[in-house]
């Protein structure tokens, strides 16, 4: 009988393989199950917000979420983290949000700078029909907030605020964009008149686009004097979520460790999301760079970004909060205290 059973048992090598596969599968299953339980735990903490009554014409609370691709990778990294870990908690709290996606160094900065500039000069970004509709509706009594994922997005947002307060740079940028739009219209007219030169015109257009892109990049890193500071309550409270993204073959052991510990990331992100939903643990902008501003994330970035010749003039690697004028400029900005959220998890 034993000989018969033994004949059906796998050999030594197959047993090792099956044991290895079973161990890996079990670790993944346990981690994903714990991750889902953690997210559900945080959803249950904010679900009562969805049950609160609202006035007939009252708008729900709205957040603005900036999704920006991390250095060396695509926008999908930020998008997947938000969809998997953060969005379920906001949905459970019945919080409305608007996502703004961008990728590439400087793109988010331009969007924020334009929004800040328009707000300072009372330039409305809302169409007339929307204005008429909003005049009838009541704004939410709960405060809005801004959600940023990653150290790179935080840097671009703050530099965007800085450039939005620099009227000279913004006026120059707007004039450049207007000139580019006029040139584009002229080229389209020429292409319509002369079909034979389509290929040459398209090549010229590509070259002009490259040149204009470089000109915009150089204007983004141009030094501008800081005067005064951001007025209190000018910006909504900022929520800073970590976006760990380690690349490279040499970092495989560390990447595998993170892969099997997604539950820890869910715990960290969930605690911050609950603070945002409940509007608690709000603090002033720190006077020095550190953990609260995700300074440790820069060690995960590809080394190629730190070996560039214009290292100190690029947005992601430029000196940050090292000038007293810069610290004073941002000191009226409110942010959610992510370090307090980490402490509350274990209490």
Swiss-Prot record:
It is a single-pass membrane protein. It is found in: Mitochondrion inner membrane. One of its GO terms (cellular component) is TIM22 mitochondrial import inner membrane insertion complex. Residues 181-196, 202-216 have a biased composition (Basic and acidic residues). Residues 31-347 are mitochondrial intermembrane. GO terms for biological process: protein insertion into mitochondrial inner membrane. Keywords: Membrane, Mitochondrion, Mitochondrion inner membrane, Protein transport, Translocation, Transmembrane, Transmembrane helix, Transport. Its main location: mitochondrion. Residues 1-12 are mitochondrial matrix. The chain crosses the membrane at residues 13-30. Residues 181-216 are annotated as: Disordered. Essential component of the TIM22 complex, a complex that mediates the import and insertion of multi-pass transmembrane proteins into the mitochondrial inner membrane. The TIM22 complex forms a twin-pore translocase that uses the membrane potential as external driving force. Component of the TIM22 complex, whose core is composed of TIM22 and TIM54, associated with the 70 kDa heterohexamer composed of TIM9 and TIM10 (or TIM8 and TIM13). Belongs to the TIM54 family. This is Mitochondrial import inner membrane translocase subunit tim54. It comes from Schizosaccharomyces pombe (strain 972 / ATCC 24843) (Fission yeast).
């Amino acid at each position: 009988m034993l000989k018969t059973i033994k004949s059906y048992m796998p050999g030594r090598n197959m047993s090792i393989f099956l044991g290895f596969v079973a161990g890996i599968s079990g670790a993944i299953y346990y981690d994903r199950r714990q991750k889902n339980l953690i997210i559900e735990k945080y959803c249950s903490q904010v679900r009562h917000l969805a049950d609160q009554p609202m006035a007939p014409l009252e708008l729900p609370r709205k957040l603005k979420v900036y999704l920006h691709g991390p250095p060396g990778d695509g926008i999908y990294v930020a998008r997947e983290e938000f969809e998997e870990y953060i969005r379920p908690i906001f949905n459970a709290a019945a919080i409305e949000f608007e996502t703004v996606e961008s990728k590439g160094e400087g793109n988010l900065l331009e969007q924020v700078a334009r929004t800040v500039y328009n707000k300072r000069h009372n330039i409305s970004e809302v169409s007339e029909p929307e204005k008429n509709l909003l005049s009838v509706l009541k704004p939410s009594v709960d405060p809005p907030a801004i959600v940023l994922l990653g150290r790179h997005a935080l840097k671009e947002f703050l530099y965007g605020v800085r450039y939005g307060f620099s009227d000279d740079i913004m006026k120059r940028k707007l004039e450049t964009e207007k000139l580019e739009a006029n040139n584009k219209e002229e080229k389209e007219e020429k292409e319509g008149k002369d079909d034979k030169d389509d290929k040459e015109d398209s090549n010229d257009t590509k070259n002009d686009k490259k040149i204009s892109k470089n000109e915009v990049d150089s204007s983004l890193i141009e030094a501008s004097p800081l005067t005064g500071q951001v007025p209190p309550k000018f910006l909504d409270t900022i929520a800073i979520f970590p976006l760990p993204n380690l690349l490279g073959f040499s970092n495989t052991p560390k990447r595998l460790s993170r892969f099997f510990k997604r539950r820890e990331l869910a715990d960290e992100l969930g605690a911050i999301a609950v603070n945002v939903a409940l509007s608690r643990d709000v603090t002033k902008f720190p006077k020095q760079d550190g953990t609260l501003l995700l300074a440790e994330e820069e060690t995960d970035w590809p080394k190629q970004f730190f070996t560039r010749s214009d290292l100190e003039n690029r947005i992601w690697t430029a000196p940050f909060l090292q000038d007293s004028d810069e610290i004073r400029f941002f000191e009226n900005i409110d942010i959610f205290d992510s370090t307090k959220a980490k402490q509350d998890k274990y209490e």
